[in-house]
Amino acid sequence: MLQFNYTVQNPLGMDFRRTGLLTKLAKRYTDTTITVAKGNQAAKANQLTRMMGLSIKNGDKIVVTIDGPAENSALFNLRSFFEDNL
């Protein structure tokens, strides 16, 4: 299991478009569980409506947890996604 912390820096936070892109990326890792947590709430990254329910805004601190056989690849791609989009 791997994880990383990230502070959202995008003024729009994780809006619908960015959440959709993240969900699409997470769905590529069918055998790996990717979870995004904000405070005491968490959602699987491949579930769009649950991710939107986290209401991630600019300045929020999130924790991304990756568990499965493709966790190293997923970690690299997800970290790049967050740095490029959020």
What are the residue ranges of the model-derived segments?
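Short glycine-rich, polar/acidic loop-and-turn segments at beta strand-coil junctions
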Residues: 40, 49, 66-68
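Amphipathic, hydrophobic secondary-structure cores in small proteins
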Residues: 43-55
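Detector for methionine-enriched segments
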Residues: 1, 14, 51-52
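Compact, glycine-rich, soluble single-domain proteins
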Residues: 9-44
